[in-house]
Amino acid sequence: MKIDGHTRLAAVIAKPIKHSISPFIHNMAYDLTDTNAVYLAFEVDRENLEQAVENIRLHQMLGANISMPYKQEVITYLDELDESALLIGAVNTVVNQNDRLIGYNTDGLGFFRSLSNFHIKGKNLTILGAGGAASAIIGQAMLDGVEKVCVFDLRDRLAGHQERMGQMSQRLGHPIQLLAVEDLAALSDAVNQSDLFINATGLGMDGKSLPIPSDFTFPKGLLVADMTYCPAETPFLRLAREQGLQTVNGLGMLLYQAEKAFELMTGKKMPSEEIKKALIEKLEI
C-alpha cells in the first residue's frame, strides 16, 4: 500500500467498531485493483456523528460505510438517498459524489447474493430481530417478491419497531407481521410455513447464546441463516445443522455488501473470490 498526496480516504463509522473486518476487505481490494486509497475504522460517539459524516465531504473522502447503531440516524445528514435506502429507511453506505453525500443500502443485496441457488420470490421468510441490517434484508426480500414476512423480537421492543416496520410496509406495499418471540406457538407456526429462517439478533456471537429454545424443532427443507460470521457456526446454526438442515453464516453477506459498496465508491469491480479466500484464512473458518 502506498500513501502519497493523492491517496483517498474511506472508512466505516460505528460504535463499537474496533472489531470490524471491513478495513481488511477494502484495503485488500484497493491493493488488488491498484486503487490509491486507504480504509480505516472510525469509532464515533452519537453526539459526533453529524461532524463525522460532514468530514466525508470536508476531507474529500471516497465515502464511508455505516454500521450499528447509526444506520437510520445517519439519513438526517445526507443530501440524497438511493431508492433502496429510501424504501428500507436505513443506510449502510455513503458515497461522496462531487461533494454530494448519497446514501445507499447494500446489506440486503449482499445477504441474498450469499444464498447460492436460493431465490426468495414467492417464498416465506421468518426473521429474528428488527434492527437496521434486518430491515435491509426484509426490504430487499419484499423488492424481490417474497410472499410472506414474519418478524419476531422481544415483546418489550415491539412498540419501538412498529412505526418503522409500518412505514416500510406502506412504502413497499407489502404486509409485515411483527410478533413477540416469547410467543413460541406463533414462532413455531411461522417457521413451519417458511422457506428461510434468519437470526439477525446478534445472539450467538458469544458462541453460547440461542435466540430460540434449545429444543426447537425446524421443519424439513428449511434454509437457516445467521448474520453472524464469527463464530462461523453459532449455536443457532449448529442446532439447525444437527437436524439435517442447510445453514449459511454471515460471511457471505459481509463480503458481498462490501463488494457493492466498493463498486459504488470506486467504480471498480471487487475481486471478491480472492478476498473471500483470504477472509476464510484470516478468520480460520
UniProtKB/Swiss-Prot annotation:
Keywords: Amino-acid biosynthesis, Aromatic amino acid biosynthesis, NADP, Oxidoreductase. The active site is at K71 (proton acceptor). SUPFAM superfamilies: Aminoacid dehydrogenase-like, N-terminal domain, NAD(P)-binding Rossmann-fold domains. One of its GO terms (molecular function) is shikimate 3-dehydrogenase (NADP+) activity. Pathway: Metabolic intermediate biosynthesis; chorismate biosynthesis; chorismate from D-erythrose 4-phosphate and phosphoenolpyruvate: step 4/7. It catalyses: shikimate + NADP(+) = 3-dehydroshikimate + NADPH + H(+). Shikimate binds at S20, I21, S22, S67, N92, D107, Y229. InterPro entries: Aminoacid_DH-like_N_sf (IPR046346), NAD(P)-bd_dom_sf (IPR036291), SDH_C (IPR041121), Shikimate_DH (IPR011342), Shikimate_DH-bd_N (IPR013708), Shikimate_DH_fam (IPR022893). It comes from the Bacteria. GO terms for biological process: amino acid biosynthetic process; aromatic amino acid family biosynthetic process; chorismate biosynthetic process; shikimate metabolic process. Gene3D superfamilies: Leucine Dehydrogenase, chain A, domain 1, NAD(P)-binding Rossmann-like Domain. NADP(+) binds at E83, G129, A130, G131, G132, A133, M227, G250. Its EC number is 1.1.1.25. Belongs to the shikimate dehydrogenase family. Involved in the biosynthesis of the chorismate, which leads to the biosynthesis of aromatic amino acids. Catalyzes the reversible NADPH linked reduction of 3-dehydroshikimate (DHSA) to yield shikimate (SA). NCBIfam families: aroE (TIGR00507), PRK00258.2-4 (NF001315). Homodimer. PANTHER family: BIFUNCTIONAL 3-DEHYDROQUINATE DEHYDRATASE_SHIKIMATE DEHYDROGENASE, CHLOROPLASTIC (PTHR21089:SF1), SHIKIMATE DEHYDROGENASE (PTHR21089). This is Shikimate dehydrogenase (NADP(+)). It comes from Streptococcus gordonii (strain Challis / ATCC 35105 / BCRC 15272 / CH1 / DL1 / V288).
